[in-house]
């Protein structure tokens, strides 16, 4: 039986030490034989469902990341059974939790149960169309979001082209889609290879974007809209602090906070 309830304390007792050696970043995680080590992407989903929010990589809150609860042995190895970098693809594809750049413009996971509160806080009471009508978003973001009125999911390269980014067009595609993820309007639904003219996959897997509404439905995503956004934010901070009680207010703001 996995004992997630005190995983934060387990990390503090059993984690390997992160260091810079010969100019290279050494991952910080749990020892291979640590009973608290997460051993599969399915286990990682279970933990995300329990705690609600989880960045992919270590940050200012000790233990608050997938990195610190997995082994450092197989990162970027390409082994689908052991590599947490591969797991993120399976998790995004599963649709059981949300994956995207939600934490300080960096990647992480949010449980389905908590996503409506996250959306209510980050959207600040506005659906995207309402935000546009009020003059609160850029035309670049409007061009991106307009594409999802026609198709539920889009490869990053498709979205970039359709939204008018690239040579001679709009600039800062990556920054724009990151801001939309931070705002609760987009997520990464999958990672897929491109298809050649014969329909055969090739190359590295590419991010596939979608709206949270396409994943879980408008009514579900909007189910916390009756709450004040500030209250949703307070509950999210409280939830993270409950699982990581050593987190300071400053650290919480750095990892969770966002100034539009």
Residue ranges and their predicted role:
Residues 2-260:
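Long, low-complexity intrinsically disordered regions
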